[in-house]
Curated annotation (Swiss-Prot):
InterPro entries: Ribosomal_uL15 (IPR030878), Ribosomal_uL15/eL18 (IPR021131), Ribosomal_uL15/eL18_sf (IPR036227), Ribosomal_uL15_bac-type (IPR005749), Ribosomal_uL15_CS (IPR001196)
GO CC annotation, single: cytosolic large ribosomal subunit
SUPFAM superfamilies: Ribosomal proteins L15p and L18e
Gene that this sequence comes from: rplO
Official protein name in the record: Large ribosomal subunit protein uL15
Native species: Prochlorococcus marinus (strain MIT 9215)
Length: 152
């Protein structure tokens, strides 16, 4: 038998009939319609809004009032401003190791980021994990170069 659009049928059991609630005891969902006896959840206009906790201050309104929530996947950097790089000589290479030797960074736990605060008077080759736009412009304007290091 060939199937045409007017002879197509859905498989039996694939489409469930909608329950007609409140249409008599014989219908199986009469009287209280499966909502129980009394209470807010059995009334008309039933569902409360998402996040409603029965009048108690809901979680989504409590949380911002509490302090010290840690930012998930926060990027931390060991930061240093451009004005500190004036301690180096012309054509020096600035990286985490050289900054530790100079005493500008003590314990390099995090990747290095160069910030653009202050003036730079020295031509340097700076190797860091991140630069601000202003820092990159100032280093290149002083004749230096910026090299990005990959995080491993």
């Amino acid at each position: 038998m060939t199937s045409t659009l007017n002879t197509l049928k859905s498989n039996s059991g694939s489409r469930k009939k909608k329950l007609r609630k409140g249409r008599g005891i014989a219908a199986g969902q009469g009287a209280s319609c499966g909502f129980g006896m009394r209470g807010q959840k059995s009334r008309s206009g039933r569902p409360t809004r998402p996040g409603f906790e029965g009048g108690q201050m809901p979680l989504y309104r409590r949380v911002p009032k509490l302090k010290h929530f840690e930012i998930i996947n926060q990027k931390n950097f060991s930061i240093i401003n451009l004005e500190k790089l004036n301690d180096f000589k012309d054509n020096d290479t600035v990286n985490i190791d050289s900054l530790v030797k100079k005493g500008l960074i003590f314990k390099p736990k995090f990747p290095l980021k160069i910030l653009g605060n202050g003036k730079i008077n020295v031509k340097l080759k700076v190797q860091a994990h991140a630069f601000t736009k202003v820092a990159k412009q100032k280093i290149e304007a002083a004749g230096g170069s910026c090299e990005l290091i990959n995080n491993k």
